[in-house]
């Protein structure tokens, strides 16, 4: 089977490094002013560290794509013109774009940089792909609404351009994210297409008849209301072979605002799946679907990949992300046979935990917990820095993470 690119999100420099070390061939990143994500303070890539981020990716042997897919107003264009020199100096391997004004500036000031056409352009057919190819794009990121058979038809008719497709992550209830609900419900304060969506599709709704304004009716038999607009998360790990056979060149995971653990665990799972498929095209991928249940999700669906979406693709009683396993701690150092960790969720002496690293994955037991003063304690609380001893320790603790073992039963697939 031919090699394809595993493309992971990079919300900051740390996530960028973990994504690559856990298996990504490329990362996509953006700065707040020009990409469709509003990052939390302290977790952003800025104009000042953008070059460092791209250089780090290159040092680790991966590509870095700069996301400039904002729908730009006049003031955005003016800001982009002022920033274009630093963007160019960062030397990204490509820029991801959707707005024609932004595209025009990139072609003018960064003519040697490849153009990747964002999924925000809703590219659904081969004529659109031909248009972007003739316009000078080197890659089109296809709309999530395409079935695999449609991708194959596009590839058959347009063989001379790269195709990128989403394989995992949150989905917008609107066509490829072009939603106005957030803007409407927040009186223009939180625009989805400027990276600040309030996610009204995740809110709980009840039915009201106009002549009975004080009577609220449940849409579903659930005391919390019905999340009728909330789509499940996309998961196509069991359909990687079909996507590759259809002609996809890059497999993309959503999630620049997701956690370090999420990015690492998802990258590792898809890397292992792709590596096994390369050795055996008949390999059973279901074990990787089970593995992906250990990260945050709203239940899984194949979306439009196998044909039309169905009611089962929506989460009627899940509005917030859940996880089949809890992220417990990350490794920060070593002293003799003890490991310094930062705790993310409470741990106890003798707990069994699962440790993952870029090259390992195993279950072990916590044999000792000590605080920084060397005092033994029966547990460690969230945000504590403690020293741990294990029944079995990782061969290389750098970039190691730990989580609970087992998978909760709520996760579903449509």
Spans of model-derived segments:
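Surface-exposed amphipathic alpha-helical tracts and adjacent flexible/coil segments at the periphery
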Residues: 1-22, 26-38, 53-54, 60-70, ...
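Aromatic- and glycine-enriched glycan-recognition loops and surfaces
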Residues: 41-51
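N-terminal active-site wall of soluble small-molecule enzyme domains
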Residues: 62-131
